[in-house]
Amino acid sequence: MTLDPSPRSTRRQRLHAAATAVVLACSAGAFAPASAAPVAPAAQPTAVTTATTAATPYCGIRWGSLPETRSGYSSATIHNVRAGRHACFDRMVIDLKGQVRGYDVRYAPVYREGSGAFVPLLGAADLRITVTAPAYDQDGRATYTPRSPNRLVDVTGYRTFRQIALAGSFEGQTTFGLGVRARLPFRTFVLPQSGGVSRLVIDVAHRW
């Protein structure tokens, strides 16, 4: 025998069915792809080329501390040695009567020409300067006779120079010792003749 459901029971079933439908609809919406405006793709990082640049050199100086040499002999003779202070470096100048041809400037121990005796210098580094020109003329007479061979120039108060010494002149070449505060960058160049005199210039920077 089939019993008809009561109105209250039927209404409860309808409400339950409606609630179930709403839940299913919401669930379906949660998993369905959104039809809203498309999401803009994430911004890609802009490629930036970073160049590795060295620190700005002191006073723009790009010298080094390796030997600087030039070959050649001449009849020029050495007549004087001078020194001066500049904003970024100390300068040594060798005056020659005639054209400078060859030289060798490097950080190395200094020895006397002829005897080979070691020449001690003030400072933490020794710069040896050899010029292929004598300090005497063709008759063997000295063209450069400093009062104190071990102190050619008073460099008191210089930031880099500590001592300039004459190590001798023998067999057509002359050697000088330049004592400096530390092994610092330097440059060597020749100034053209003026009044028959050329100049060999050695600049040593105050720091790296």
Predicted regions and their residues:
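C-terminal region of N-terminal signal peptides and the immediate post-cleavage residues
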Residues: 28-56
